[in-house]
Curated annotation (Swiss-Prot):
<dbReference type="GO" id="GO:0009279">
    <property type="term" value="C:cell outer membrane"/>
</dbReference>
<dbReference type="InterPro" id="IPR009009">
    <property type="entry name" value="RlpA-like_DPBB"/>
</dbReference>
<dbReference type="GO" id="GO:0000270">
    <property type="term" value="P:peptidoglycan metabolic process"/>
</dbReference>
<dbReference type="GO" id="GO:0008932">
    <property type="term" value="F:lytic endotransglycosylase activity"/>
</dbReference>
<dbReference type="Pfam" id="PF03330">
    <property type="entry name" value="DPBB_1"/>
</dbReference>
<dbReference type="InterPro" id="IPR012997">
    <property type="entry name" value="RplA"/>
</dbReference>
<feature type="lipid moiety-binding region" description="S-diacylglycerol cysteine">
    <location>
        <position position="18"/>
    </location>
</feature>
<dbReference type="InterPro" id="IPR034718">
    <property type="entry name" value="RlpA"/>
</dbReference>
<feature type="signal peptide">
    <location>
        <begin position="1"/>
        <end position="17"/>
    </location>
</feature>
<dbReference type="Pfam" id="PF05036">
    <property type="entry name" value="SPOR"/>
</dbReference>
<feature type="domain" description="SPOR">
    <location>
        <begin position="285"/>
        <end position="361"/>
    </location>
</feature>
<keyword id="KW-0456">Lyase</keyword>
<dbReference type="InterPro" id="IPR007730">
    <property type="entry name" value="SPOR-like_dom"/>
</dbReference>
<feature type="lipid moiety-binding region" description="N-palmitoyl cysteine">
    <location>
        <position position="18"/>
    </location>
</feature>
<keyword id="KW-1003">Cell membrane</keyword>
<dbReference type="GO" id="GO:0005886">
    <property type="term" value="C:plasma membrane"/>
</dbReference>
<dbReference type="GO" id="GO:0042834">
    <property type="term" value="F:peptidoglycan binding"/>
</dbReference>
Amino acid sequence: MRKQWLGICIAAGMLAACTSDDGQQQTVSVPQPAVCNGPIVEISGADPRFEPLNATANQDYQRDGKSYKIVQDPSRFIQAGLAAIYDAEPGSNLTASGEAFDPTQLTAAHPTLPIPSYARITNLANGRMIVVRINDRGPYGNDRVISLSRAAADRLNTSNNTKVRIDPIIVAQDGSLSGPGMACTTVAKQTYALPAPPDLSGGAGTSSVSGPQGDILPVSNSTLKSEDPTGAPVTSSGFLGAPTTLAPGVLEGSEPTPAPQPVVTAPSTTPATSPAMVTPQAASQSASGNFMVQVGAVSDQARAQQYQQQLGQKFGVPGRVTQNGAVWRIQLGPFANKAEASTLQQRLQTEAQLQSFITTAQ
């Protein structure tokens, strides 16, 4: 009888040990909330907005004998690894979300993140960060963890051997943003709509200028290339997706300093204006200037020209529209020096809440 009780106790102890071990294996520690120990960085890219999950693209699946389980809680997901780059041509295939693949959009493919969803992608080699929209599945093979569209790869300056970090951004129904991708980060709202100008006529009516609607694209890194063969530094402004901010009026890259322009004085025939409203002297006064202020890029030439004309009339400066691949760049100027271009930048920011940067006339 004593032996039977001893056997029962041993069996009970083994069962308790198995239960304890199994319980420990199934327990997953809740990750600590993201804590920001550094400065807040403003990044750009895809504009995160609440979207219902795709009904067909978020099921667990198998491929090439391997099982993939869709991430149910992106707030607990962080990943780092090599990034691939989309090489398909526009319209050649559909993404897992059912959308036509477009390499000019800031999108990405991931094996298990929800579709659609958003993530902050960081190039660990140079610190550049942008927001991408996950709308496709992959990659499969080559030990890559994510596949970036050509536009996203260009903005990050990545190659097929670049290591990146993936931090999901969670968008609530009210539009608020959270998740690992929001640690030390604020997402720049990219809009090109101009508010009504201030009423300086003592009650006279003023007309508002509206920006182009539709497929407005973020400024591509390719628009920042200067004539300097060494290229632009990786520490570009926050508006362009890098972790540091340049001082106002600083050009990304080194350009030759233009020859000093002679100062010509002439009798004033117009009413005096306040210092804050001084219009920079542009093309007609400084035909030899080579500094331009770029305010954005859109995919439609007619809309770009209309927007450039509206801005030119509002701010009293000439401008131009130039093609860069699939987009049309909207630029104001030229100006004789960076100081004049910077003056317009300040007006664009204060009067129209428009982000811009200084580049050189090609």
